[in-house]
Amino acid sequence: MKKNTHPEYRQVLFVDSSTGYKFVCGSTYQSEKTEVFEGKEYPVCYVSVSSSSHPFFTGSKKFVDAEGRVDKFLKRYSNVRQPAQQPQPEEDALPAAKGKKKVVTKKKK
């Protein structure tokens, strides 16, 4: 069996960025940053949403994203719009078909 194939499982400090709530949980998360929490030093993982800030757990309706992804995109690139180039008809480039089309039928035996 190969050794050192699995990441190290250890206690990690998770910090909710929006509320500042901290909790320790076992994880394989790798981090260079560490913080002291309740007298012990832990690697730190910053999360944007946790049980202390998620509307399902808090019971409040907190609107996180004021604009949708499409609105942000349109706002960012609205001044860059360029008119689309119309393809030129290439009637002269194609030769006109001459003669009749061949119809292929099966012969009866």
UniProtKB/Swiss-Prot annotation:
Coiled-coil annotated residue ranges, if any: none
Keyword hit for NAD: no
Keyword presence, Ribonucleoprotein: yes
GO terms assigned for molecular function: structural constituent of ribosome
Superkingdom of origin: Bacteria
GO annotation terms (biological process): translation
Region of interest called Disordered, as start-end residue ranges on this chain: 79-109
Matching InterPro entries: Ribosomal_bL28/bL31-like_sf, Ribosomal_bL31, Ribosomal_bL31_B, Ribosomal_bL31_sf
A Pfam family per the record: Ribosomal_L31
Assigned GO CC terms: ribonucleoprotein complex; ribosome
Ranges annotated as biased composition (Basic residues): 98-109
Keywords: Ribonucleoprotein, Ribosomal protein
Oligomer and partners: Part of the 50S ribosomal subunit.
UniProt similarity note: Belongs to the bacterial ribosomal protein bL31 family. Type B subfamily.
Name of protein: Large ribosomal subunit protein bL31B
The encoding gene: rpmE2
